[in-house]
Amino acid sequence: MAELSGNFLYAAFLVYLIAVPIFGGAIRGNKDKKGRPNRWANIGITLSIVGFFCHLGYFITRWAASGHAPVSNMFEFTTAFGMMLVLAFIILYFLYRLPSLGLFTLSIALLLIAYASMFPTDISPLIPSLQSNWLYIHVTTAALGQAILAISFVAGVIFLLKHVDQTKPSKKTFWLEAIMFILVTTVAFIAITSAFRLAGYEAEFNWVDKSKEKSVMVYEMPALVGPHQGELLTEGRMEPLVDLPALFSGRKVNTVIWSFGAGLVLYGALRLIIRKRISALLHPLVKNVNLDLVDEVGYRAVSIGFPIFTLGALIFAMIWAQLAWTRFWGWDPKEVWALITFLFYAAYLHLRLSRGWHGEKSAWLAVIGFAIIMFNLIFVNLVLAGLHSYA
């Protein structure tokens, strides 16, 4: 069953990969006589639905194989997040018929699946504190809310790619290009992790955690930074330049540093090849979009995703926390950043509805909101130690 689950996920990845250039063709094509999307868009959304059902097949079969909802580690949560992102896109596509939304959303879904595959994919039993029905109630609802909110990010990027003047450098082009750099860095992380994995690189360290207990940590990349009071056990491997405090996971911080460095190299190479900003390269893909429609999509995504996220990430989370740890709130890093996410999107809705922050301002807010979600998913989950930290 676990092997079947992996096959379903692989099939979903391939179908999404095929759908992306088809949506690209739909953007360049003309609409039919009644103003509806052309046949390429229809093929693209059909493939998206097929890919989603493959993705759903992965989710169901992995659930059957593990005996619990597959959202208990970084691989499972990120793939589930990608599945819900595609579901949110399909629903909004049928409401707004916007092919460019498919091009960019499916590209993000592909990155999420590839990113997830860099983490251990083995099925493992749940620890006692997670053996509760609230696991899939809390986590899946929060993931669905985040996925719908992510659509507002996609709409915001589409809006900014068309609206921001690419003919001259400015603060707007700088920050828009920063988004492109982060996406390139994600690709670099996938590439460099795969390369070291294929090379079979491993280095073991003894280290002391924040509870002052000794344990072993395995690095899969050369150690630029080491764990707290780390001692290298594997001969012939690189000694770290500096040890980190016990608050941080040395292996994960090391991975972040390697990924950032590889991202700089890859981004620099791309700029040398294309001889323009990546955002300027993507501009022709959105030149025909209706900015008012894209702005509406972004707002609707937040208005739908915000209450779902609030229900899953805060209300259900507090109920489960009370049942598991006899307290509703503990100021765990993940709890704090869930609250920050809630407050940010509440401010987004307030500024849009009360202060008239439409268009470009709304698009930038959507981008910042997604950055907070990704910070919570990647940095808080992986780098900071806490009750919610994924191994």
From Swiss-Prot:
Q: InterPro entries, alphabetically? A: Cyt_c_assembly, Cyt_c_biogenesis_CcsA, Cyt_c_biogenesis_CcsA/CcmC
Q: Which GO terms describe its molecular function?
A: heme binding
Q: Where in the cell is it found?
A: Cell membrane; Membrane raft
Alphabetical GO biological process terms: cytochrome complex assembly
Bridged cysteine pairs (disulfide): none
Keywords, comma-separated and alphabetical: Cell membrane, Cytochrome c-type biogenesis, Membrane, Transmembrane, Transmembrane helix
Record-annotated membrane-spanning stretches: 7-27, 40-60, 75-95, 101-121, 141-161, 173-193, 254-274, 301-321, 328-348, 364-384
Give the knockout phenotype.
Cells lacking this gene exhibit a lack of cytochromes c but normal contents of cytochrome a and b. Can sporulate.
Residues annotated as coiled-coil are: none
The answer to whether UniProt assigns keyword Membrane to this entry is yes
**What membrane topology does the annotation report for this chain?**
Multi-pass membrane protein
Q: What is its main location?
A: membrane
Q: Which residues form the signal peptide?
A: none
GO CC terms: membrane raft; plasma membrane
Q: Which domain of life is it from?
A: Bacteria
The answer to whether the entry has keyword Cell membrane is: yes
Function description: Required for the biogenesis of c-type cytochromes.
Subunit info here reads: Interacts with FloT.
Return the similarity comment. Belongs to the CcmF/CycK/Ccl1/NrfE/CcsA family.
- Name under which the protein is recorded: Cytochrome c biogenesis protein ResC
Tell me what organism the protein belongs to: Bacillus subtilis (strain 168)
Gene from which this protein is expressed: resC
